From Swiss-Prot:
Location of the protein in the cell: Cell membrane
Stored PROSITE patterns: HD, KH_TYPE_1
Top enzyme category: hydrolase
One family name in Pfam for this protein: KH_1
Top-level taxonomic group: Bacteria
Taxonomic path: Bacteria, Bacillati, Bacillota, Bacilli, Bacillales
Signal peptide boundaries: none
Name of protein: Ribonuclease Y
Gene: rny
Ranges of residues in domain HD: 336-429
Alphabetical list of InterPro entries matching this protein: HD/PDEase_dom, HD_domain, HDIG_dom, KH_dom, KH_dom_type_1, KH_dom_type_1_sf, Ribonuclease_Y, RNase_Y_N
Organism: Bacillus cytotoxicus (strain DSM 22905 / CIP 110041 / 391-98 / NVH 391-98)
Main location group: membrane
Membrane topology: Single-pass membrane protein
Biological process (GO), any one: mRNA catabolic process
Keywords of this entry: Cell membrane, Endonuclease, Hydrolase, Membrane, Nuclease, RNA-binding, Transmembrane, Transmembrane helix
Amino acid sequence: MSNTVWILISILLATVGAVVGFFVRKSIAEAKINGAANEAKRILDDANREAEALKKEALLEAKDEIHTLRTEAELEIRDRRSELQKQENRLMQKEENLDRKDETLDKREQMLEKKEESLVARQQQIEELESKVGELVQKQQTELERISNLTREQAKSIILGKVENELSHEIAAMVKESEVRAKEEADKKAKEILSLAMQRCAADHVAETTVSVVNLPNDEMKGRIIGREGRNIRTLETLTGIDLIIDDTPEAVILSGFDPIRRETARIALDKLVQDGRIHPARIEEMVEKSRREVDEYIREVGEQTTFEVGIHGLHPDLIKILGRLKYRTSYGQNVLKHSMEVAYLTGLMAAELGEDEKLARRAGLLHDIGKAIDHEVEGSHVEIGVELATKYKEHPVVINSIASHHGDTEPTSIIAVLVAAADALSAARPGARSETLENYIRRLEKLEEISESYEGVEKSFAIQAGREVRILVKPDTIDDLEAHRLARDIRKRIENELDYPGHIKVTVIRETRAVEYAK
């Protein structure tokens, strides 16, 4: 019974609690709803107020922007109106200018029409005058022909002849003046170049002989050199082609011969025989052959050394060997190899001054006398032989022409060829370069004066400057100026044909007229 009551009471209390909780929750919910509604209303009111403010602000901004745009539009319209006004003014001004130009052109056209009418009238007047002048000229020509007995063509020919003669004299005078001026300038420049080349080129005074001396340890060696019945000396002379002179000269044997290479071969062979002490025909033959090989090798070395000193490269080996043989060749006592090197240096220096190829100039100068190395072995002049050698070994055409023209046998085709000829003459003619015997020297001077004085009208002649110039004084009553030129040419030809001399000889004919009066 009590449990049931308690259950009922519990149920009742639970029910009452549920009802009370329901109402409490309801009241709380209503309160929340009311608060939310109030909050929503407040938010809505705030939003409405903010929207109203934004609306007002937007309206104000829109009004400001509309005002700004309106102002800019008005300014742009004003500017466009101003620009249009300016364009309109310019167009009006151009129109006015065009109107003025039209007026000016109309005036000019009228003036041109007037001038054209005037020119037509003048042309008619000129034609009338020309017709009258032509008639007058024809009358004058007819009258002149009648008076002078000359036709128009004859008179024209005479006048043209006089004019041509006057012009030819004037042209000749101008040409002569130009030639004199050019010659003076060329001579001055040539002297400067030659002086510079000579100052920069140091050359030796050359003196060569045709004999060699072999020193002996004692005079008993002379008998051994001669051998039994002279067989040793005959063998040596036969193999070398050199004369052995054994005289009273103590402890010396003289080798005489005009071929320096054979003389050098004999000297070396005899030196070796004397040092060896075994002198008999077989040994002599062996030593001579060995000496020939040594001389050939020495000649090759000399050729190579020469090309190195001169600064030339690319020569054919055979040509180098032939070049070395020039060491044993002389011309009027001047060593040909030294002479060729001197010509090479001079040609190179002058070519450098003129802006030509210096190396090619040196090459041409060094090889200009290459034919002299074998001219005693091959038929022909040294110029012809040199040209053949240069052609055979494919030298430069300028080098070949320089060899061919350095003695005037052919015309030079390049400046270098002319320089080679000048350097050759300069090297040969300088003092001390070439030598002659005293007898030949005196005989040549006497012959120079004899040739000069053999002509009629020559008063006296003098050979000066060691025979390199001859001055001839002539009688002015017998020889005039033109005859003096002819006399100089004739004497020059006779000297070239009758005398043998190194370098050049200058022939000067002097004609002097003196007028003397005495005042009393």
